[in-house]
């Protein structure tokens, strides 16, 4: 994988700007870029972004740009002021661009219906292969070239702020277009540079196991509650507005276990669900809504590309299914001492219990069997990297393997980590007042 250069500037469709509270000015941008940057005649993707900066009396075009890469995969950006870390960035004098990565938010969003427009299942699967980190990065580069089209080459670099999967994209960016970047900040640990999810997901199951132990130690009364709920769901077909509440789907609430406050959130759902069964012998609408709106599996890109986001020349092969089957602690057997929740994982049965995913099961099968995934990282370039990379890393991270992240850190020159055993994966949001000063201390201070 060579360092890339030949990306054409994005085409600006329109831009609208508005003044808001705190002397902030936001702009909404729409761009057009090729679906395939190496073959521009194969179609286009529309990108949506919001930018924000502090107004200093005039609209100062000299403020340095910082790109934000959202976690996921498959999540669009929130509105800028919803990000807890943003004030510390604005205070440093950056102008921040929140880009909905291709297929998310308002950037040619991928849904079951929009995918169906592509034709048969193979065509849908082939399209989705264009929606991984490598092409997200090429889109970013096209947008950067538009923003800096009138700037001298030595003044056309920008910075990157990234979280979670956005950090995967950021490391790809460093390896593909190092001459475009000033610096990179990542919350959520360095990405695992692996070839297939089988190198990652068993490690994440191990963290999920530890989080289950913490959960039941804090809320031992939930052992019986969860068993009663699972028994009820086995014996009754419970309809949701967009699918069916199967025992496995309830078990997937565990995706929250690795977040700050996640254990308490799950306890609240369990307590409320059991209370419904105790009082009414059925689940009430507010409880069902609460369960249905938890997690991310209804997100099409997340469900279809969560395992392929690791793949480089190898197939994913439903790795999470294999891990769950191999570990009896994640069984739904009520004779187990405890019924454990699963963590961040995509299982094949999700394509039966989520309405948005039902028609996509054949697409998911094609992607799971596919091995023709391109390279996501230029490791030779990363080994000689000159772009400063600053990373906030949680030891007990249920979504990005700490061990594999540290291995990545050892392979990327000029990458510095601040490692903390009291942070979880979302600390850049929930503990921004700790994480952001720590990240900037890596940049502005020195250890020796």
Curated annotation (Swiss-Prot):
Pfam families found in the cross-reference section: Abhydrolase_1
Keywords of the record: Aminopeptidase, Cytoplasm, Hydrolase, Protease
Active site, renumbered: 164, 397, 425
Source superkingdom: Eukaryota
Pathway(s): Secondary metabolite biosynthesis
GO terms, molecular function: aminopeptidase activity
Cross-referenced InterPro entries: AB_hydrolase_1, AB_hydrolase_fold, Peptidase_S33, Serine_prot/Carboxylest_S33
First-listed, main subcellular location of the protein, grouped into a coarse class: cytoplasm
Domain AB hydrolase-1: 64-191
One GO BP annotation of this record: proteolysis
Gene Ontology cellular component terms for the protein in this record: cytoplasm
Subcellular location: Cytoplasm
Catalyzed reactions: Release of N-terminal proline from a peptide
EC number: 3.4.11.5
Role: Proline iminopeptidase; part of the gene cluster that mediates the biosynthesis of aculenes, a unique type of norsesquiterpenes that contain a nordaucane skeleton linked to an L-proline moiety and are of mixed biosynthetic origin. The pathway begins with the synthesis of dauca-4,7-diene by the terpene cyclase aneC using farnesyl pyrophosphate (FPP) as substrate.
Subunit structure comment from the entry: Homooligomer.
UniProt record similarity statement: Belongs to the peptidase S33 family.
Protein name according to UniProt: Proline iminopeptidase aneH
Organism: Aspergillus aculeatus (strain ATCC 16872 / CBS 172.66 / WB 5094)
């Amino acid at each position: 994988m060579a360092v890339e250069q030949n990306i054409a500037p994005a085409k600006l469709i329109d831009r609208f700007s508005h003044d808001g509270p705190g002397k902030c000015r936001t702009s909404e941008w729409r761009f057009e870029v090729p679906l395939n940057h190496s073959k521009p005649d194969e179609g286009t993707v529309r990108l949506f972004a919001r930018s924000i900066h502090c107004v200093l009396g005039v609209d100062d075009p000299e403020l340095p740009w910082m790109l934000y890469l959202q976690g996921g995969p498959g999540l669009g950006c929130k509105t800028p002021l919803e990000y807890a870390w943003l004030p510390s960035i604005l205070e440093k004098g950056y102008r921040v661009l929140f880009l909905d990565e291709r297929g998310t938010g308002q950037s040619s969003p991928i849904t079951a219906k929009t995918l169906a427009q592509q034709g048969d299942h193979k065509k849908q699967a082939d399209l989705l292969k264009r929606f991984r980190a490598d092409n997200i990065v090429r889109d970013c580069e096209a947008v950067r070239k538009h923003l800096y089209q009138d700037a001298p080459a030595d003044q056309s670099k920008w910075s990157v702020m990234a979280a979670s999967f956005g950090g995967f994209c950021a490391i790809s960016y460093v390896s593909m277009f190092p001459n475009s970047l000033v610096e990179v900040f990542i919350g959520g640990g360095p990405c695992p540079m692996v070839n297939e999810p089988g190198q990652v997901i068993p490690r994440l199951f191990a963290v999920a196991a530890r989080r289950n132990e913490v959960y039941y130690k804090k809320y031992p009364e939930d052992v019986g509650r969860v068993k009663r709920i699972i028994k009820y769901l086995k014996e009754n077909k419970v309809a949701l507005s967009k699918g069916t509440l199967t025992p496995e789907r309830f078990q997937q609430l565990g995706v929250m276990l690795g977040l700050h406050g996640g254990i308490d959130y799950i306890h609240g759902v369990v307590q409320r669900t059991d209370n419904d069964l105790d009082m009414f012998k059925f689940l009430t609408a507010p409880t069902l809504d609460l369960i249905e709106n938890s997690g991310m599996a209804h997100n099409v890109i997340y469900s279809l590309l969560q395992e392929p986001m690791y793949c480089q020349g190898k197939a994913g092969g439903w790795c999470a299914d294999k891990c769950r089957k191999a570990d009896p602690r994640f069984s739904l057997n009520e004779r187990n001492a405890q019924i454990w929740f699963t963590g961040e994982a995509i299982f094949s049965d999700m394509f039966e219990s989520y309405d948005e995913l039902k028609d996509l099961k054949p697409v998911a099968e094609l992607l799971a069997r596919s091995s023709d995934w391109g390279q996501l990282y230029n490791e030779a370039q990363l080994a000689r990297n000159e772009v400063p990379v600053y990373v906030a890393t949680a030891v007990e991270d249920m979504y990005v393997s700490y061990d594999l992240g540290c291995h990545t850190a050892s392979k990327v020159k000029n990458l510095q980590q601040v490692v903390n055993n009291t942070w979880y994966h979302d600390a850049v949001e929930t503990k921004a007042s700790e994480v952001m000063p720590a990240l900037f201390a890596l940049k502005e201070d020195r250890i020796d």
